[in-house]
């Protein structure tokens, strides 16, 4: 179940929140959902070089609030805020309501799944070896605090004729645990051989409730040793070479060396 399903959809209302937060009647829902998809596609193309991790859309009372999470907020804002004003005007034209745009900085882009996937696809488009790109991204994520990461690439890797899938994992990635904070990202690289898909799962720890305490493993040195047997008692066969029993010599004969049957 957890291996196949989308990690974010699996954890909605448990440890993850929706990317679109608004309410609509049955007649308006489809139109507003289509509008959200078009806005996200527009922002993805417009801010391709701004390292945008995710976009949150809210619609409070005939208004729209769009929050853009980016590791390069200066590229989104532009010189003296010119780019952000042009972006706001274009979004208002598309949505037909007043739009407020907020920019949030992603302080650790190395552990953001979407940014990792985008970085790998950009390297694949520049003809960098996919194994090198994947392993470098995993090392950076683990170095900056991720508890586990899994990266999967699918397609005509290195230009081979038959498409295949390769994945690497480091650390723990518990996809079945609902309280686990799993960040998921997907991106596509448009190469001369075709499209290569990249999926990234990043495990950042667990979401604990108010009454939950984190599980801390006891260091191995401080673990109690199991109580042993009293001194002076030992099992039969202990302390003899090869675990031989009492009275058994080489070849299983008795200490006298004579064969019991032949009497030799």
Curated annotation (Swiss-Prot):
Biased composition (Basic and acidic residues): 221-239
Molecular functions per Gene Ontology: mRNA binding; rRNA binding; structural constituent of ribosome
Ranges for domain KH type-2: 39-107
InterPro entries for this protein: KH_dom, KH_dom-like_a/b, KH_dom_type_2, KH_sf_prok-type, Ribosomal_S3_C_sf, Ribosomal_uS3_bac-typ, Ribosomal_uS3_C, Ribosomal_uS3_CS
Compositionally biased region (Gly residues): 240-255
GO biological process: one example: translation
GO cellular component, as recorded: cytosolic small ribosomal subunit
One Pfam family recorded for the sequence: KH_2
Presence of the UniProt keyword Lyase in the record: no
Superkingdom of this protein's organism: Bacteria
UniProt entry keywords in alphabetical sequence: Ribonucleoprotein, Ribosomal protein, RNA-binding, rRNA-binding
Stretches for region Disordered: 211-264
PROSITE patterns found in the cross-reference section: KH_TYPE_2, RIBOSOMAL_S3
NCBIfam families per UniProt: rpsC_bact (TIGR01009)
Subunit record text: Part of the 30S ribosomal subunit. Forms a tight complex with proteins S10 and S14.
Function: Binds the lower part of the 30S subunit head. Binds mRNA in the 70S ribosome, positioning it for translation.
Family the entry assigns: Belongs to the universal ribosomal protein uS3 family.
This protein's name: Small ribosomal subunit protein uS3
Source organism of this protein record: Ralstonia nicotianae (strain ATCC BAA-1114 / GMI1000)
């Amino acid at each position: 179940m957890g291996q196949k399903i989308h990690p974010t959809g699996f954890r909605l209302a448990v440890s993850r929140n929706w990317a679109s937060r608004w309410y609509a009647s049955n007649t308006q829902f489809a139109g507003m959902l289509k509008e959200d998809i078009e806005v996200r596609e527009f922002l993805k193309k417009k801010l391709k070089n701004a390292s945008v991790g995710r976009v949150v859309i809210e619609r409070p009372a005939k208004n729209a609030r769009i929050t853009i999470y980016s590791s390069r907020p200066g590229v989104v804002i532009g010189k003296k805020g010119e780019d952000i004003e042009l972006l706001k005007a274009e979004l208002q034209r598309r949505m037909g309501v007043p739009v407020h745009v907020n920019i949030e900085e992603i302080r650790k882009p190395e552990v953001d799944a979407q940014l990792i996937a985008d970085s790998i696809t950009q390297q694949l488009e520049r003809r960098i070896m996919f194994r090198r790109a994947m392993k470098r991204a995993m090392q950076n994520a683990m170095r900056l605090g991720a508890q586990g990461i899994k990266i999967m690439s699918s397609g005509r890797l290195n230009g081979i004729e038959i498409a295949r899938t390769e994945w690497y994992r480091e650390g723990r990635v518990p996809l079945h645990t609902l309280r686990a904070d799993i960040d998921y990202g997907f991106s596509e690289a448009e190469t001369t051989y075709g499209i290569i898909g990249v999926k990234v799962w990043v495990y950042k720890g667990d979401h604990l409730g108010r009454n939950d305490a984190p599980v801390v493993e006891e260091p191995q040195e401080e673990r109690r040793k199991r109580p042993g047997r009293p001194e002076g008692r030992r099992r039969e066969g202990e302390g003899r070479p090869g675990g031989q029993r009492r009275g058994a010599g080489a070849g299983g004969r008795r200490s006298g060396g004579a064969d019991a049957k032949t009497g030799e």
